[in-house]
Amino acid sequence: MSEAKNLLAQGLWKNNSALVQLLGLCPLLAVSSTATNALGLGLATTLVLVCTNTAVSALRRWVPSEIRIPIYVMIIASVVSTVQMLINAYAFGLYQSLGIFIPLIVTNCIVIGRAEAYAAKNPVGLSALDGFAMGMGATCALFVLGALREILGNGTLFDGADMLLGSWATVLRIDILHLDTPFLLAMLPPGAFIGLGLLLAGKYVIDEKMKARKANTRVSVPQLQDGYAEKAL
């Protein structure tokens, strides 16, 4: 497997920052009340990861190891401030909805972790790809959890999508369940923990099935080879 494919596989599934490393749980649980909020924060985090990894990788040869962490934090804070201003300018409704969790991306362990563990040791292109893969992995986990909570809590999907995509996105709203009253458990923090637990369990089941399938394939290949050898004799 090439390095690029390995980075994508690690970021999106095998080493998913939310479902495997369990990093950034504070925004994951707090913002994932709707699919729109989850998608907005996930995309913002992905953009920060890509830009931060690129900058750290480009400057890695000139940053003294003794002061690298403060410099990384300064880079991350600069990128997050820029992203925050962009969201404020072009998606003000989403900016109000996400609130403090946009600037809190600075303290997200995913961002500083990838800068230190990968970007500081690898070329710019691969570092940017690593940031993209890790960000999209976190975004997918956020979106699935947000969609699950929104459907169970309000019976809708993509409610408030216009805050992220503009006024045309109001047509994306889907009424899936017709609830007389909202299911508050799904919308409150306990529902977020339960939903995350279900996602973790689902990933574990899928991983175990994939391992079993690979094991069966490895066992069947030698048997076929032995059968051909017996026929040849």
From Swiss-Prot:
E.C. number: 7.-.-.-
Places the protein is found: Cell inner membrane
Topological relation to the membrane, as annotated: Multi-pass membrane protein
Transmembrane segments: 18-38, 39-59, 69-89, 92-112, 128-148, 182-202
Coiled-coil spans in chain: none
Pfam assignment, any one: Rnf-Nqr
Subunit field text: The complex is composed of six subunits: RnfA, RnfB, RnfC, RnfD, RnfE and RnfG.
PANTHER family reported in the protein's UniProt record: ELECTRON TRANSPORT COMPLEX PROTEIN RNFE, ION-TRANSLOCATING OXIDOREDUCTASE COMPLEX SUBUNIT E
Name of the featured protein: Ion-translocating oxidoreductase complex subunit E
